[in-house]
Amino acid sequence: MNTNNSVPAPPFHCDDTTDLLPYLQGMIGEIKKSGCTRFLSITLETGYSDPLAILEEIHRPGQAVCYLERPATEFSIACGGLVAEAAFSGEKRFSQAKNWANSIFEMTPIVGNHKFPGTGPTLFIAATFESESTREVSPKPLQVFLPRWQVLRKGGQNFIIYNTEMNAVSSPAS
């Protein structure tokens, strides 16, 4: 996307003092020129955060969520909301999902420090053992989503990740 260097380099480290406005203005300018849609993932390092407590506080019924925890490795992550989602069935569902995931990652600039798994854009899945839905009300055999938000705690470091869709009518101020 940055072929003519009109978009400043994304900040590698983000905290509450990081000014993202120049980067966002440049990115939206490029999107307007190209007419394409992009996703954006911003990782912000924070003080202490408890992913499960945050999930419990902001979860709304019907909202896609996920929570994973590995106490032995001091790892926990919670996520919610949908920025992008897809469902797959049939014998090639995993290869189709991989292609979809690669296309999402190709159009997702990453801002901030993404040194741990779970920082930066992270796709979450739900899968059944069946290749096809057995009933009309059954979940699809493979569902994948990019969440709107993620909260990660890893070995004493804490991160909040915000994912969003950017298009020609996006505003860097909102």
Regions found by a protein language model. Name each.
Residues 1-174:
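Signature of the chorismate-utilizing enzyme
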